[in-house]
Each structure stands twice: as C-alpha cells, then as structure tokens.
C-alpha cells in the first residue's frame, strides 16, 4: 500500500516541480546585468569619453576644454574634410564625429556628471543605478529655483501694485459721488479759485465736456489730499508689496522679538499697567481684526472700547454677547431676512427624491 501511495503522489509532485524550476529561470534575464562599463545610450555610448577627447582621467578642466576646442575646429561640419582613417579616438570619419566630441565634452566639463561617469567606469555592475543617475540629471530642470522664486515674487508684487492703485482710484471716484464729500471738495476748490481757472477761456476754447472732466479731476485731487482712506482701499505703499515684505522680513522678525521681550518683561514680570497702545492692541486681537481693519474704525468707536475696558476678557465677553443680540434684533426686523424665514417655513429647501410621480 505504501508503494501504491507513493505512485499516486509521484505524478502530482512531478507535475509541480517543472514550474518551481522554471520561475527562477524567468527572473534570470531581469537580474543579469552587463559586466561592461560602457553602455549604449549612456554618455558616449560604447566609447570612452576620455579617449574621444584624447585626455586622461586625471585631466583638468582646462585640458579638457583645450582638447575639445581642437577637435571641434577639426570636426566641425562647416570645416570638416574627410580623410582616410580620420576621426576622434579612431572613430570613423563621419558627421557623427562632431556630435561624439560634443557629448564627451558635455559629460566631462560638469563636475557632478564627471563623477557619475567615473563611478560608472569603476563600477560597471551597477547597471540600473547608472541609468537612474544619467536620466535624473538629464531630466532635471536647468533653471535655478531661486531665479524662479525671485521672478514669481516680482510678478506678484507688480500685480499687487497695479491692483491696489485700481482699488484706490475706484474708492476716490466713489467718494466724489457722495454728496457730503463732493460739496466739501467743491467749496475748497472755489476758495482756492481752481474751478474758475478751469472755466477760463483762452485762445484754445474748451468744450463743456473738457471743462466737466477738468472739474471732476480737481474735485478728486482735493479728496485725495484731504481724506485719509484706510483699509483695503488705502493709497498703495511700496513697503507693503510682497517683494519688500520678503526683503524686510528679517528686520520685522527682529523687531517683533524685541517687542515681545519688552512685553513679557514689563507686563508679565514687572506687572506694569497697560498703556493706551497696549490696550488697543489687546482689543484688536480679541476682535480678530487686522491692523488696517482696526485703523479704519472711527475714533469714537475706539474711545468707546477703552471706556468699556474691553481689554479685560470678562468685559469683552459681555460686549460680544451684546453685539450678537443686537445683530439678531436687526435680522429679525430686516424684511429680506423675514422673507427668507417665511420661505424656509412654508417651502423649505429643495429635496432630491427618486420616487416617480
């Protein structure tokens, strides 16, 4: 029975053994690497770049450049005259000779590429590693990242500058249409006699449209000089551009560290009372407002903040709750908000269903 059992197992085991032996054989071509250092498609191909230029591996950059210039003049397509047995390093005389010389020079003139090439000559067994280093350098971007960053920052700064000027001019045009500011600017222009000069008739008679445009420009210029616009529509400042912010970042960082150290020493360690500037700073941080937003507030609002002592956390929480209640009352009396609530109550938002009507 043991012999019969062995006979029954024999065909199954014998059927599996060829597949087990065949699997390693299929992986052999993938693991086999060429033993030769010179590989077709890498650097100078099957030619030694040093032999192509006629220099040794210890040659300096100057010697490599000198050898390249001599061979380039000799094998340049415009000057090349084929002769029997002529060619760099014994290469056949053809138009490929000049390309081979140029490739050898490009390989050896760069220190990093030359190191990779020398490493390939010394370690021919690392076949796939040589391919990786060769194509990683060829496909790497040639442009310096620092130049790209600098150009991008300059482009953003230029866009910021013109965009801010456009917003500022729009704000001036809007203020010129507001009766309050327009009447004041017109009175100032009359006092200075600017409107009379615009209407004076000289040798070149002006049309009504030209006079109107000139008066409009006078009013806008007075508004620019008399009104200090703050916030997002303020007059553009060069120091606010991204380029100057990046350049001045170390200065701002040092000044912030010095300010923070003074704050900790004066108020946390010595326990001094806050001044008006420090109180407004704490209030602004509690309200989560930027400096430009806080500066755009009216003076009476800031005085109210100081009067209510909003730099104290408990007082600010009470003020915040009051503002939320006031906002709810305004929304409750707002006709548009009432219509929205009525619509939500009667119809509600649309629903997506898959039930066939």
Swiss-Prot record:
A cellular-component GO term for this protein: endoplasmic reticulum membrane
Name of this protein: DnaJ homolog subfamily C member 25
Membership in a protein family: Belongs to the DNAJC25 family.
PROSITE patterns per UniProt: DNAJ_2
UniProt-listed InterPro entries: DnaJ_domain, DNAJC25-like, J_dom_sf
Cell membrane among keywords: no
Lipoprotein keyword on record: no
Domain J: 48-121
Membrane association type: Multi-pass membrane protein
A Pfam family hit: DnaJ
Transmembrane segments: 19-39, 147-167, 241-261
Keyword entries, A-Z: Chaperone, Membrane, Transmembrane, Transmembrane helix
Biological process per Gene Ontology, one example term: protein folding
Primary localization: membrane
Subcellular location: Membrane
